[in-house]
């Protein structure tokens, strides 16, 4: 298992009200990698239009017959819209109780794997205890994310595995602000300078 370095790796990005990119309005993004080469993250609070059984079928992980016999938790496993980059590629953020050669340790107890094998394991209920599946990711060129942060596009916040893997997507944006001590109704898009 590899470990990624970078200041923002393992942190949350919370879109400010003045976010000028419609794809990220009210988004909460988990930063999986950050370095001089750029940054990569997964949007946590946007659902994808495809459901997990359809994704498994499309990827050839299961057959139509197997799809009918999936357990209810697997049938209802949400697939997130991870971001606009590489929208047909799957990514899994997960607890560290499942690893393989390609797994990357992002932060303590949080891993990242982008293989078909982890999807197979999850579909058979032999995968990690906690997982978040996303199609696509959010990507930034060198210096781009830092510029967006300095121009008040994002707030940065630490997170925990329990918050990351919560299933209530509709509350994740407000809850991420509340965890920082910010009342979402008081957050404004403009910043003052002294």
Curated annotation (Swiss-Prot):
SUPFAM superfamilies given for it? VC0467-like
Q: Which domain of life is it from?
A: Bacteria
| Cited InterPro entries | AlgH-like (IPR003774)
Q: Which GO terms describe its cellular component?
A: cytosol
Q: Which Pfam families match?
A: DUF179 (PF02622)
> Where are the annotated coiled coils located?
none
Protein family according to the UniProt entry:
Belongs to the UPF0301 (AlgH) family.
Task: List the protein's name.
Answer: UPF0301 protein BQ03640
Q: Which organism is it from?
A: Bartonella quintana (strain Toulouse)
């Amino acid at each position: 298992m590899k470990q990624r370095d970078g200041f923002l790796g393992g942190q949350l990005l919370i879109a400010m009200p003045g976010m000028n990119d419609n794809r990220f309005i009210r988004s909460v993004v988990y930063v999986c990698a950050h370095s001089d080469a750029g940054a990569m993250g997964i949007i946590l609070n946007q659902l994808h239009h495809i459901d997990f059984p359809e994704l498994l079928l499309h990827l050839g992980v299961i057959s139509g017959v197997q799809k009918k016999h999936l357990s209810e938790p697997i049938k209802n496993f949400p697939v997130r819209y991870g971001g606009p980059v590489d929208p047909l590629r799957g990514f899994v953020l997960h607890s560290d109780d499942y690893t393989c050669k390609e797994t990357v340790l992002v932060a303590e107890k949080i891993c990242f794997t982008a293989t078909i094998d982890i999807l197979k394991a999850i579909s058979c209920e032999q995968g990690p205890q906690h997982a978040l599946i996303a199609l696509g990711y959010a990507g930034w060129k060198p210096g781009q994310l830092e510029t967006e942060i300095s121009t008040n596009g994002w707030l940065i916040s630490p997170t925990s595995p329990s918050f990351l893997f919560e299933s209530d997507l509709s509350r994740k944006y407000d809850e991420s602000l509340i965890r920082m001590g910010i009342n979402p109704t008081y957050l404004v898009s403009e910043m003052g300078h002294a």
